[in-house]
C-alpha cells in the first residue's frame, strides 16, 4: 500500500492562514505510530506464548471431541456438554487467538470490514458458549449429586440445551456484530521500518452514543462472567457440602474402616478439584474484564490507555485463552472415563484389536470400581426413576440405584430394603 502524504496539497490550506502556521498546526495534530507495537524480543515472547496455548487448545479439545465421537459409551449427558465445551474452545482457538495476537502485535486493523464483523461475532459467540456450557456442566453435576433421584436429563434434552446455549450466545453478541465496523483514524498514521507512512484503520464498536457502549459492556460482564461465576460457585459449594456430609460405610469391620479412610481422602480430592475449577475460571477471566471495565468507566489518560492496550491487554487475553486450553485437562483428564476412553481409542488405532481395547477400557470389575467411587448419603425415593444420563437407561432392579453415567450401583449390605432410612449412593469420584 502506497504511503499517503502527511500533509495536504497547498490548495487545501484554510483561508486566513499562511504556510508556516498551517505546517506548525499539522505537525502538532498528526500522530505517527510504529507499525509494530513491540520490539522483536517482546514480540517473540508473545508469539511463543500464544503458539503454546494455541497448540494446547487444538490438541486437547480435538482429543476430547475424538474420544466422545469415537466411543458410543462416552455419549452421556455430561460428556455431551464437555463435547460442546471442547467445540466452543476450538472456535476460541481458531478465531480468537490468531486475530488477537495479530491485533496485539501491529498497530491498527489489517483486515476488511466483513472480517471485522465476523471475527467479533464468532469470538463473542464461542466465548459465551464456552462459559454457558461450564454452567450447564455445573448444573448437571449438582442435579446428579445433590438431587440424585430427580428426573435426569436425557440426551435429547441435553442436545436441546446445547442448542439454547448457542442461541443465547448469538443473541447476546448481535449488538456487537451490528456496531462493529472498520473506520479510518483521522490524523493518525503508521510508520514502517523505512519511515513510510500508512493510514491507520481500527475495528471497533461504533455506538451512536458512548453511554450505550458502557451499558452493553456491563450487560456482557453480568451475563458472561458475573452470573455464570455465581452459579458455578453456588452449585459446587452445594456439591462439596453434600460430599462432606456423606457418611462412610455402615459396617464396623477393619476393612470397612480402611475403606472409609480411603473414601474420605477421595472426597477431599473431589472437593479440591471443585475449588480449583471455580478459582481457575475466576482468575482466568477477571483481569480481562477489569481492563474492559476500566476502558469504558475509568477516566484514563492517553498514556494509560496506550500502556493498557500494548502490554496489559495481550497478557489478559492470553490468560483468558489459557482457560480454553486447560479445559480439556480439567474436564477431560481428571475424568476417569475420558482417560480410559483415550487409552481405548489409541490402543485400538495403534496396535490393539478393537474388542480388546473396548474390554480394557470399559471393564466393570467390582474391585476396580469400588476403589474409584465416592459414597454419598441420599434419602430414599418412591419414584425409582432410572438415570437417563448414560447409554443404559433401564429400570434398576431391587437393591440397585441408578448412577448418572448409566451404570448401576449394587447395594448388598444388610438392612438395605425399602424400609431403610438412608441408602449410600456410589458415584465415580472424577465424574462429578
Swiss-Prot record:
Pfam families referenced in this protein's UniProt entry, alphabetically: 7tm_1
Organ and tissue specificity: Expressed at high levels in the hypothalamus. Moderate levels found in the midbrain, thalamus, medulla oblongata, testis, eye, whole brain, cerebral cortex, striatum, hippocampus, cerebellum, optic nerve, placenta, spinal cord, pituitary gland and ovary.
Compartments, as annotated in UniProt: Cell membrane
Residues exposed to the Cytoplasmic side: 65-80, 139-158, 236-273, 331-432
Extracellular side: 1-43, 102-117, 180-214, 295-309
Principal location class: membrane
Cystine residue pairs: 116-203
PROSITE patterns registered for this protein in UniProt: G_PROTEIN_RECEP_F1_1, G_PROTEIN_RECEP_F1_2
Gene Ontology CC entries for this record: cilium; plasma membrane
Gene Ontology molecular functions: G protein-coupled receptor activity; neuropeptide receptor activity
Ranges of biased composition (kind: Low complexity): 380-406
GO annotation terms (biological process): cellular response to hormone stimulus; G protein-coupled receptor signaling pathway; neuropeptide signaling pathway
Name by which UniProt lists this protein: Neuropeptide FF receptor 1
Organism: Rattus norvegicus
